[in-house]
Curated annotation (Swiss-Prot):
GO BP: epithelial cell differentiation
GO cellular component terms listed in the entry, alphabetical order: apical plasma membrane urothelial plaque; endoplasmic reticulum; membrane; plasma membrane; protein-containing complex
Pfam families, per database record: Tetraspanin (PF00335)
Extracellular side, ranges: 36-59, 113-230
Subunit structure: Homodimer; disulfide-linked. Interacts with uroplakin-2 (UPK2).
Summary of the function given for this chain in its UniProt record: Component of the asymmetric unit membrane (AUM); a highly specialized biomembrane elaborated by terminally differentiated urothelial cells. May play an important role in normal bladder epithelial physiology, possibly in regulating membrane permeability of superficial umbrella cells or in stabilizing the apical membrane through AUM/cytoskeletal interactions.
Primary location class: membrane
Stated name of the protein: Uroplakin-1a
List of glycosylated residues: N170
Entry's localization field: Membrane
Residues annotated as transmembrane: 15-35, 60-86, 92-112, 231-252
Originating organism: Bos taurus
Topology relative to the membrane: Multi-pass membrane protein
Length: 258
C-alpha cells in the first residue's frame, strides 16, 4: 500500500506539473511575441529588401518566414503541453516532446540563418558600396529599383552614399557614366533641401560646400535596419530556445515518472 501511494505521489507530483505548466505558458506567450515580431520583419518597415535581394543575401527574410511558422507552432504546442501536463498522460507528453523537438530544430535553423546573413551584410560596408556604385542610375530593373531605394534613404536620413559623398568621386560607378563629375560629382539628392524639397544652394552643393551637402554616409542607417530585423528573429529566437530546452528536459523527466 505504501509503495502504491508513493508511486501515485510521484506520478502526480504537483511541483513538476507546476513547472511544466508555468514553463509552457511562458513559451506560448513568447511564441505569440515571436510571431508578431517576425511578421513585422517580413513587412520590411525599413524597405531595404532590394538591397539584400540584389546581393543574394536575403535569407534574413527567409529566417523570418521560418520564425513565423515556429512562433505560431510554439503557441499551439505549448498550449497542448499545458493540457498534457495536467492530464498526466504518457502518450500526450510523448507527442508534445516530439512536436516541440521538431519546432526547436526549425527555430535553430531560423536563428542561425538570419544571423549569419546579417553578419555578411553589416560587417562588410564595401559590399553595400559596390552595389550602390554598380546599380545606382543603371538602366535595368535592378538599377531602377536600387536607385529608388537609395534616393529614399538619402532624402529621409539626410545622408549621401555609403560612407559619404566621396564614394561617388573616388570610385567608378554607373552614375558617373551618365553624369560627368564636372556636371555633378554626386547625386543631386545629396544636397541639403528646404522644407519644400528645394535645394538650399545647388551650386554650393555641387562644389562640395559642407553647409549645402549631406556629409554623413548611409551605412549606419542600413546597418541599423538589418540589425533590427536580426534582433527580432535571431536573438529573441535564441532566448526562446534557451528557455524551451529546460522545459523539454523537465517534460522528459515527467514522462519517465508516468
Amino acid at each position: 500500500m505504501a509503495s502504491a501511494a508513493a508511486a501515485t505521489t510521484e506520478k502526480g507530483s504537483p511541483v513538476v506539473v507546476g513547472l511544466l505548466v508555468m514553463g509552457n505558458i511562458i513559451i506560448l506567450l513568447s511564441g505569440l511575441a515571436l510571431f508578431a515580431e517576425t511578421v513585422w520583419v517580413t513587412a520590411d518597415q525599413y524597405r531595404i529588401y532590394p538591397l539584400m535581394g540584389v546581393s543574394g543575401k536575403d535569407d534574413v527574410f527567409a529566417g523570418a518566414w521560418i520564425a513565423i511558422f515556429c512562433g505560431f507552432s510554439f503557441f499551439v504546442v505549448a498550449s497542448f503541453g499545458v493540457g498534457a501536463a495536467l492530464c498526466r498522460r504518457r502518450s500526450m507528453i510523448l507527442t508534445y516532446l516530439i512536436l516541440m523537438l521538431i519546432i526547436y530544430i526549425f527555430e535553430c535553423a531560423s536563428c542561425i540563418t538570419s544571423y549569419t546573413h546579417r553578419d555578411y551584410m553589416v560587417s562588410n560596408p564595401s559590399l553595400i558600396t559596390k552595389q550602390m556604385l554598380t546599380f545606382y542610375s543603371a538602366d535595368s530593373n535592378q538599377g531602377r529599383e536600387l536607385t529608388r531605394l537609395w534616393d529614399r534613404i538619402m532624402i529621409e536620413q539626410e545622408c549621401c552614399g555609403t560612407s559619404g559623398p566621396m564614394d561617388w568621386v573616388n570610385f567608378t560607378s554607373a552614375f558617373r557614366a551618365t553624369t560627368p563629375e564636372v556636371v555633378f560629382p554626386w547625386p543631386p539628392l545629396c544636397c541639403r533641401r528646404t522644407g519644400n524639397f528645394i535645394p538650399v544652394n545647388e551650386e554650393g552643393c555641387r562644389l562640395g560646400h559642407l553647409d549645402y551637402l549631406f556629409t554623413k554616409g548611409c551605412f549606419e542607417h542600413i546597418g541599423h535596419a538589418i540589425d533590427s530585423y536580426t534582433w527580432g528573429i535571431s536573438w529573441f529566437g535564441f532566448a526562446i530556445l534557451m528557455w524551451t530546452l529546460p522545459v523539454m528536459l523537465i517534460a522528459m523527466y515527467f514522462y519517465t515518472t508516468l
